Amino acid sequence: STGSLGLDLALGVGGLPRGRVVKIFGPESSGKTTLCLEAIAQCQKNGGICAFIDAEHAFDPVYARKLGIKVEELYLSQPDTGEQALEICDTLVRSGGVDMVVVDSVAALVPKAEIEGEMGDSHVGLQARLMSQALRKLTGHIKRTNTLVVFINQIRMKIGVMFGSPETTTGGNALKFYASVRLDIRRTGQIKKGDDVIGNETKVKVIKNKVAPPFRQAEFDILYGEGVSWEGELIDL
């Protein structure tokens, strides 16, 4: 389960599918990490073992606890390079000992050559190549061990686009092809209590779905410090 009733319905299989790669992308502060943390909490409730690869070095254990995550039972890794992060992900998946791995985020998977290089050096296509190699290797193991792997990705703007969408995600096209489910998450409005903003109205579109019909969408509220509002969803349903 994703922690959102509406999104579980939109996904068509009652939540995120096991043995698959899932990509969640959206602008900054749209609720990508919150959605993943909610899914981890649900997975743990069902006795699952979860891992969080925090390439952004931004994991907040206090917030995670508020969302119902047993932090002491969560495998947490904060790798230094993109290679290290993907190697850890592959090792966890191959072990067959974890049910769900979250990588936060693809944009933060910086290749070693880029970290060790000079500021002005050109590293065109390095990250895309890294992702492509890793996913080719990973998908077989994911299928075999029936692990769910979720990649979080940010949206960037392409410069000088005249036609079509100027939005793009980092890390090349490999993830688009290898992901069985792609979720586009957006903040559509604010939730206020008096003058105070207490949360965000959120919309998730299922852009790609290989396990059920795609293009469904769900709307729900994410409250600051609390996560997805179950009550709000029940009332809406």
Curated annotation (Swiss-Prot):
Where does the UniProt entry say this protein principally localizes?
Answer: cytoplasm
UniProt xrefs under Gene3D superfamilies: P-loop containing nucleotide triphosphate hydrolases
Q: Which region is the signal sequence?
A: none
GO terms, biological process: DNA recombination; DNA repair; SOS response
Q: Which Pfam families match?
A: RecA
Compartments, record wording: Cytoplasm
Kindly list the GO molecular function terms attached to this UniProt entry: ATP binding; ATP hydrolysis activity; ATP-dependent DNA damage sensor activity; single-stranded DNA binding
Q: Which UniProt keywords apply?
A: ATP-binding, Cytoplasm, DNA damage, DNA recombination, DNA repair, DNA-binding, Nucleotide-binding, SOS response
* UniProt keyword ATP-binding present: yes
Question: Which GO cellular component terms, listed alphabetically, does the Swiss-Prot or TrEMBL entry include?
Answer: cytosol
Q: Which residues bind ATP?
A: 26-33
- Which InterPro entries does the annotation name? AAA+_ATPase, DNA_recomb/repair_RecA, DNA_recomb/repair_RecA_CS, P-loop_NTPase, RecA-like_N, RecA_ATP-bd, RecA_monomer-monomer_interface
Keyword DNA repair assigned: yes
Q: Which NCBIfam families match?
A: tigrfam_recA
Which PANTHER family does the record cross-reference, listed alphabetically?
Answer: MITOCHONDRIAL DNA REPAIR PROTEIN RECA HOMOLOG-RELATED, RECA
- Protein function: Can catalyze the hydrolysis of ATP in the presence of single-stranded DNA, the ATP-dependent uptake of single-stranded DNA by duplex DNA, and the ATP-dependent hybridization of homologous single-stranded DNAs. It interacts with LexA causing its activation and leading to its autocatalytic cleavage.
Q: Which family does it belong to?
A: Belongs to the RecA family.
**Entry protein name:** Protein RecA
